[in-house]
Amino acid sequence: MKKGASCERKQAWISSGKAGAGNGFLMEVCVDSVESAVNAERGGAGRIELCSGLLEGGTTPSMGVLQVVKQSVQIPVFVMIRPRGGDFLYSDREVEVMKADIRLAKLYGADGLVFGALTEDGHIDKELCLSLVALCRPLPVTFHRAFDMVHDPMAALETLLTLGFERVLTSGCDSSALEGLPLIKQLIDQAKGRIVVMPGGGITDKNLQRILEGSGATEFHCSARSSRDSGMKFRNSSVAMGASLAHSEYSLKVTDVTKVRTLNAIAKDVLV
């Protein structure tokens, strides 16, 4: 095979988001920093979902973070496109922000994009999603956990198929993937391989086996984070940068290599 053709096939494999799935499963780790991205890869993650604002469920990361993450890891990096926390009903100006972020994410090397949008009555916003999917191409697209806020998840899954999404991230429309396990299984059964249904939300080493065995999923999404103490010696604990003192500036949440490895081993035992 010619070298150029080989490179093209490799790039297509990476862009599909399936690189790292050679073991029969794929673990996606959501991260919000370069350190966490590197740790996810070291632990055996097959793909990264790059976000900011994980306490809000994930928002669009800076392009600086994306650029350095792409320089630091080899596994695919899917970029969250979400202009703010809160609901998934977007104004015209917010849509313009999303479109601009998609263009920039592609420019800075994103391997895939992750987004979702709903109408006011809890249905997939077909018109908006279709235009965003077209803008994302040729990269693969994931519909994120906006799916868990839809009025009719079974109908919504079929809508995502017609719009061209390759996968959907879901907790089964419940507070966690474990709580939503019955619906996740129904969705995977309905999908019949036409779209990847990826469980996510509260997945840990304590429940991963049950979720994989109970759903039939071959991809899953987790954060696998631990708290790391700040290196600051001088500390003013009476000041918080956010709205609450509950989250200390002197405790940092980062992806834990050991946790990722443990989840990887559990998935191997179940699926390989």
From Swiss-Prot:
Q: Which Pfam families match?
A: CutC
The record's InterPro entries line, in alphabetical order, gives: CutC-like, CutC-like_dom_sf
Main subcellular location of this protein, as a coarse class: cytoplasm
User: What are the BP-aspect GO terms?
Assistant: protein tetramerization
- Keywords, in A-Z order: Copper, Cytoplasm, Metal-binding, Nucleus
Highest taxon, organism lineage: Eukaryota
What GO molecular-function term can you cite, just one?
A: copper ion binding
GO (cellular component) term, any one: nucleoplasm
Tell me the compartments it is located in: Cytoplasm; Nucleus
- Assembly and interactions? Homotetramer.
| Protein purpose | May play a role in copper homeostasis. Can bind one Cu(1+) per subunit.
PANTHER family, A to Z: COPPER HOMEOSTASIS PROTEIN CUTC, COPPER HOMEOSTASIS PROTEIN CUTC HOMOLOG
What family is it from? Answer: Belongs to the CutC family.
Q: HAMAP family this protein is in? A: CutC
Question: What's the protein called, per UniProt?
Answer: Copper homeostasis protein cutC homolog
The organism encoding this protein is: Mus musculus (Mouse)
Q: Which gene encodes it?
A: Cutc
